[in-house]
């Protein structure tokens, strides 16, 4: 959920007031999140006790799809730039993102209402874009949309491989006993 860190707990004093995944469910002791979502992002997060599964999902073989609500009415030219790859900063260096799939969503996606209001229409239009990546640098989607002049206001991961968020509600934890990936 929005406002949670993609870790189960922390012993850090500066993170004492943060929210952690461990507050949502009694996960096994050796559970790990597969990939991360930053505190201001939300959506599908897989959790496993299998390190090989985690490595596979985090590999460049598995697509991750995000819906990004951006500031302004995103243009066809901006979408084309996303598709080709854009320059972002990563670890203090310039990095060109790999080509990706990107499309402007004509309709507002059916997502749960976020607990913290984003803004209202007095500040200008917003639009939604679907971005499908198979890499995942630190805050990559946010940096990509900002680099093309349309900063991200809300970011939701809606798919990892063939696994979709569907009608899950904020904070839902769905246990899967017999899990097979078909990639």
Task: Give the predicted meaning of each segment.
Residues 1-183:
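RNA pseudouridine synthases
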